[in-house]
Amino acid sequence: MARKRAAGGEPRGRELRSQKSKAKSKARREEEEEDAFEDEKPPKKSLLSKVSQGKRKRGCSHPGGSADGPAKKKVAKVTVKSENLKVIKDEALSDGDDLRDFPSDLKKAHHLKRGATMNEDSNEEEEESENDWEEVEELSEPVLGDVRESTAFSRSLLPVKPVEIEIETPEQAKTRERSEKIKLEFETYLRRAMKRFNKGVHEDTHKVHLLCLLANGFYRNNICSQPDLHAIGLSIIPARFTRVLPRDVDTYYLSNLVKWFIGTFTVNAELSASEQDNLQTTLERRFAIYSARDDEELVHIFLLILRALQLLTRLVLSLQPIPLKSATAKGKKPSKERLTADPGGSSETSSQVLENHTKPKTSKGTKQEETFAKGTCRPSAKGKRNKGGRKKRSKPSSSEEDEGPGDKQEKATQRRPHGRERRVASRVSYKEESGSDEAGSGSDFELSSGEASDPSDEDSEPGPPKQRKAPAPQRTKAGSKSASRTHRGSHRKDPSLPAASSSSSSSKRGKKMCSDGEKAEKRSIAGIDQWLEVFCEQEEKWVCVDCVHGVVGQPLTCYKYATKPMTYVVGIDSDGWVRDVTQRYDPVWMTVTRKCRVDAEWWAETLRPYQSPFMDREKKEDLEFQAKHMDQPLPTAIGLYKNHPLYALKRHLLKYEAIYPETAAILGYCRGEAVYSRDCVHTLHSRDTWLKKARVVRLGEVPYKMVKGFSNRARKARLAEPQLREENDLGLFGYWQTEEYQPPVAVDGKVPRNEFGNVYLFLPSMMPIGCVQLNLPNLHRVARKLDIDCVQAITGFDFHGGYSHPVTDGYIVCEEFKDVLLTAWENEQAVIERKEKEKKEKRALGNWKLLAKGLLIRERLKRRYGPKSEAAAPHTDAGGGLSSDEEEGTSSQAEAARILAASWPQNREDEEKQKLKGGPKKTKREKKAAASHLFPFEQL
């Protein structure tokens, strides 16, 4: 127990000794400090770093020293650290540093001193006696536990300025949370709205680009239908091909024609192409020299020859619009696919990388790994970079902790910045060894000679480049599979080629180090996106013809040389009819391609005006596509069955879908799940939904499936009974459980109604027997006057305002009252029109009366208040013969005088003066009679 207390330090309560023992320990410490300072120089620097302290702790005592040497040296080190701590404290206080940071440094220094004491005591445990342990305890006690010093220092650390503490009340917390929630919801709404808008713009751009490409195809097909070009093409065809009738054309005939065409016409990329000449002029020139500038012109020439032979031919175009999904949406998935490329330029898939990561590793004691770790820094750094980032935070193993400083320094040199690693990785070429089986699971790394001697590379060594081999892992199945996949992914390169050519080609193609870059490179390489189709009447089918590669009747070959992805393939015949033939050429049409295309309804609506009138031929082609799809094997991945046009899994069924019958045939299994035909998947509906389709559920039928309803009525029922919230309350029925709706019969002039007092007329077949529908406005008013039964017709429901509202269309009446209601309604409309006419006439007369009254008032006001203005008018005409400016001045003055003369107060003053001069006075009765026809404001 004594040793443990000495090594780790006793509690603070037991550190306090008697005054006598403290005095003795202080005296002994002062003597030993003097001896220590005589042997060692006082330190001039601040606290040493943790690394230097660790090295000094591992240092041994001087050889040949006495037995007390280690103890003295230990005392000296502890004393030096305490002195350094005091110096740091004084400097911090003198410089005015923040005192809140100093206790942490003091605490770290205390931990360092205690750690040093523990290490020294544990190393010298077997050599020192009990007294030595007590001396160490007494020496470290004053340094760690001086009560007076610590109390004074803690008082000095008290803050001088007042401290403000803010306490949030529950009401404030609720308000803050509510505002944060509202802000977050608004940001989410705004973000979704922006994404929705951007998605709509990108989709519209995709559609516009697709239509532009289709219009370009129409233009090219129209040029290839010109009779002049047909005549030129017919003139160069040998006679053995012109003697065959179009109905006798077969695949053998087309193969011979393609062979002759390839032998006659050549492709010369050096031919000139003038922008001023149109396509027709260019093709005429190409016929003259029996040559084409590119594959597109070659296809156009062969199309002219086939149409000159009166063969039904299509120009097939693989349209390449911008992708339907933007690049940002595709780039959401992280960089699992951004991996190192192999010699052929192909990248490892994520599954291969996972297999490589899970390979068992050999022990560290093997010679190969020692050579790889010590002699080659760049491959090891490259290997570390290729591994997952989650290993960076893992704790170091015990073997790494036991390594010496040399190994740590070597590891430190391997840690480079990311930019440095990329530059090194770009100079590394990967070479496969196909000859030896022992090194088949590994790979060789080498640098090109021109880049290995780069003077800017600090880690490079002079001399020829050395081959650096990676450690060969154990021969496991995963390793052999990954190696074989990597070998097959290198563009099917022949392993027998010379090493020099393979290394040079790999160094050129190794610049693309990620799979995304390779995809962009493959997409940039344009393929052959146009070929032909000829209808063989003997076989009654369309045969594809690739005149560039000399292939007839091989759709997969056309797909092989076309630009990927193949999304839209259309065929345009000589009459301009268009047919979507993507299903014939794309092998992944049912799984991948359909998801990359625009909405099927929009695309079908776009091509509907150009649909061929030969429906029998179109139906046979559809059956051919269906037979081709049925011959393909079942998909092996579960995700491919979702929305598959032929197959379905139970896990992918929607809420209102079910498989019927329950004993449906199982076509196969995918990972233990039964695969059913898509024809067995039926859509179920509730009773109300079937009624909208003019069908009702038969009596006694049990719901085929129960789901949770979300109508307002179902929600209210669940809220009323909490125990039924999780139960399925909506029964669904299949088509086989329903029958046609039988409309009721009208009896005694009464229209049959539903429980809401209306008539459901979702389809014309739901009309009650003996009734008719009249689409006349306000017919129910006329029927109410005549006491005839009239009911509104409900033709559907419209959801707005949070609820479903019925949509009405006309009225349902009995057939015997039809003529009476029509006559009464017409009479009612005549009366309404007459009343409207009278109302308009009355309003017009009132307006004319008001206008006449206004004119009379105007004349009366002129007579009463306008004598002076008329008298002043002749004075304005006296100034004749003036210039235009003078005339304008006089006219403005005259107008001002006229207005002043006609002002009401001045006229009233004149009238008062005339009254004062003389004349008979009017009585009040006369004045009242004279002012009876005036308005109130005129009587003032």
UniProtKB/Swiss-Prot annotation:
What's the short name of a Pfam family annotated to this entry?
A: BHD_1
Which GO MF term does the entry hold, naming one?
Answer: protein-containing complex binding
Q: Please note every region of biased composition (Basic residues).
A: 381-395, 916-927
Give the Phosphoserine positions (modified residues): S94, S129, S140, S397, S398, S399, S453, S460, S883, S884, S891, S903
Q: What keywords appear on the UniProt entry? A: Chromosome, Cytoplasm, Disease variant, DNA damage, DNA repair, DNA-binding, Isopeptide bond, Nucleus, Phosphoprotein, Transcription, Transcription regulation, Ubl conjugation, Xeroderma pigmentosum
- Where is the segment annotated Interaction with CETN2? 847-866
Cite a GO CC annotation.
nucleus
What function is annotated for this protein? Involved in global genome nucleotide excision repair (GG-NER) by acting as damage sensing and DNA-binding factor component of the XPC complex. Has only a low DNA repair activity by itself which is stimulated by RAD23B and RAD23A. Has a preference to bind DNA containing a short single-stranded segment but not to damaged oligonucleotides. In absence of DNA repair, the XPC complex also acts as a transcription coactivator: XPC interacts with the DNA-binding transcription factor E2F1 at a subset of promoters to recruit KAT2A and histone acetyltransferase complexes (HAT). KAT2A recruitment specifically promotes acetylation of histone variant H2A.Z.1/H2A.Z, but not H2A.Z.2/H2A.V, thereby promoting expression of target genes.
Q: Which family does it belong to?
A: Belongs to the XPC family.
Q: How is this protein named in the record? A: DNA repair protein complementing XP-C cells
Q: Which organism is it from?
A: Homo sapiens (Human)
